[in-house]
Amino acid sequence: MIIIKFNDDITHTYNSFEEILKLENYNDIILMNCNNNNLSNLPKLPKSLKFLYCSYNKLSSFPKLPNSLKHLYCYHNDLSSLPKLPKSLKLLYCHNNYLSSLPELPNLLKILYCNGNYLSSLPELPNSLKHLYCYHNDLSS
């Protein structure tokens, strides 16, 4: 099941991923929840998207993330890398993937869950960061 929320606060539910592909021209989508769907890829994301929930899939890569994105939940996938993160991002949940590195972290980031990956180092952490979870990685002190 796919859940889409528009600026008008109306939530729309779709039973198949194919239906989402028809939505790429909408510019007022603010939330997309496609958790638990065995997806291997995502469509082009709308520029207005603020909240993306795509955990428990089989994603190995991402399309370009929109500049408006504030929350990204992409844990329990097959990701080996993340794209450039938008400056607006405040929450990043990317745990339990195959990440060996993280991109530059945005200055507004407050919460980072990157545990259960293969990280050998972390990028510079922003001063705004309040919660960091990075256990079960290949980090050395």
Task: Report each predicted region and the residues it spans.
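LRR N-terminal entry segment and analogous cap-like coil->beta motifs
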Residues: 5-55
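Concave beta-strand-loop units of leucine-rich repeat
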Residues: 31-38, 48, 53-58, 68, ...
